[in-house]
Amino acid sequence: KAWAEKFSRSINSVLYFFQLPYLLNDPAVKKIDQGIRQIKGANYYQIKVSFQIENGGEDFEDEYLYWIDVNTFEIDYLAYNYITDGGGVRFRSAINKRRVNGLLGQDYINYAPLNKKISLSSLITEFEKGALIERSRIINSDIALLPND
């Protein structure tokens, strides 16, 4: 049963990230604009996201940072901490961007820091220095939009 629950959380996580940025308008989401940050020569809005307890879901204690390109409004980078399964922090970089019937699809490289206690805001600096460890790649293949019947 523990394996099934962990697998279910993993699938939910993939679906959550695939639906970004649309889920950021959920009523349980608390957003804080932290200004503009330059990453690899491009400017990004840095947005901190947390969740209200009520309607915030099972993982309401998780926190996120999103870096949104000021020109395209696409999320190119994100970082998050999580409590489940022993907790930790992760950083993701978007790759393989493509449009499917106007909807942005993208894959991610999933990184972990050497120090699990690092702050979310420090992860982008560690990424730019090449100091994060690649843990996995999230590849969203065969993306298709089905008619809403």
Describe each region flagged by the PLM.
Residues Y45-I143:
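Gly/Pro-enriched, hydrophobic low-complexity segments
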Residues N148-D149:
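Short, solvent-exposed mixed-charge patches
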Residues K1-F60, Y82-D85:
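Flexible, processing/modification-adjacent segments and terminal tails
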